[in-house]
Amino acid sequence: MRSGVIAQKLGMTRVYNDAGEHVPVTVLRMENCHVVAQRTVEKNGYTAVQLGVGMAKVKNTSKAMRGHFAKAEVEPKAKLAEFRVSPDNLLEVGVEITAEHFVAGQKVDVTGTSIGKGFAGVMKRHNFGGHRASHGNSITHRSHGSTGQRQDPGKVFKGKKMAGHMGQTRVTTQNIEVVSTDSDRGLILVRGAVPGSKGAWILVRDAVKASLPENAPKPAGLRAGAKAEAAATEGGE
């Protein structure tokens, strides 16, 4: 199991494949995605890596976090996230992961926070059909109707579809295809929509319901450098 990455959603556009077909894509950008810390079985009880992306102002970073980033020899990060990995894919602290971590045609799972819609009615939130427009209907056109039964059971069951806060929840979309990557600009183009607004942080992982392509780099797609080469060598042993 490889590490995932943290990317920022830039928006949607379109590209054309070799057959001339129009493909809607979401553009995700990876910016300074470094390994900030390790989690090992001996010390933490599980194996994972903590990644950080973006840049945060030093004055807006707490003293504890400044020490955390200094220990990893990386600049303060705007976003941190942990990814579970197998022991053979554990990355060294300080290495940088690039967009080449994924390959074209690969399936990935993306996780983000959906766009908040505020307090919404049942017709918008749950796609209810609503009531009649006339013939005796009075101000209940968009109402959800009855909420329960009678004295028995005498309550509203949990999970009843009603009006309420819509959106702004953690959403994972599975098996999205990677159309292409651009390592120089740190871009990942994935087919279709991705949960979240423009500028939102998105977690991208290898799909759990699809096999990993044979040409996918292991333990990760790393930036060329002394630390990266050392980590890749250790991972291949």
Swiss-Prot record:
Positions of region (Disordered): 133-155, 213-237
Keywords: Methylation, Ribonucleoprotein, Ribosomal protein, RNA-binding, rRNA-binding
InterPro entries linked: Ribosomal_uL3 (IPR000597), Ribosomal_uL3_bac/org-type (IPR019927), Ribosomal_uL3_CS (IPR019926), Transl_B-barrel_sf (IPR009000)
PROSITE patterns: RIBOSOMAL_L3 (PS00474)
Taxonomic superkingdom: Bacteria
Post-translational modification: Methylated by PrmB.
Keyword Cytoplasm: no
Biased composition (Low complexity): 220-237
Listed GO MF terms: rRNA binding; structural constituent of ribosome
Residues recorded with modification N5-methylglutamine: Q151
BP GO terms, sorted: translation
Biased amino acid composition, Polar residues: 135-150
GO cellular component: cytosolic large ribosomal subunit
Transmembrane segments: none
Pfam families, A to Z: Ribosomal_L3
Subunit description: Part of the 50S ribosomal subunit. Forms a cluster with proteins L14 and L19.
Family matches, as PANTHER family: 50S RIBOSOMAL PROTEIN L3, LARGE RIBOSOMAL SUBUNIT PROTEIN UL3C
Family classification: Belongs to the universal ribosomal protein uL3 family.
Reported function: One of the primary rRNA binding proteins, it binds directly near the 3'-end of the 23S rRNA, where it nucleates assembly of the 50S subunit.
Designated name of the protein: Large ribosomal subunit protein uL3
Organism annotation: Brucella abortus (strain 2308)
The organism's taxonomic lineage, starting at the top: Bacteria, Pseudomonadati, Pseudomonadota, Alphaproteobacteria, Hyphomicrobiales
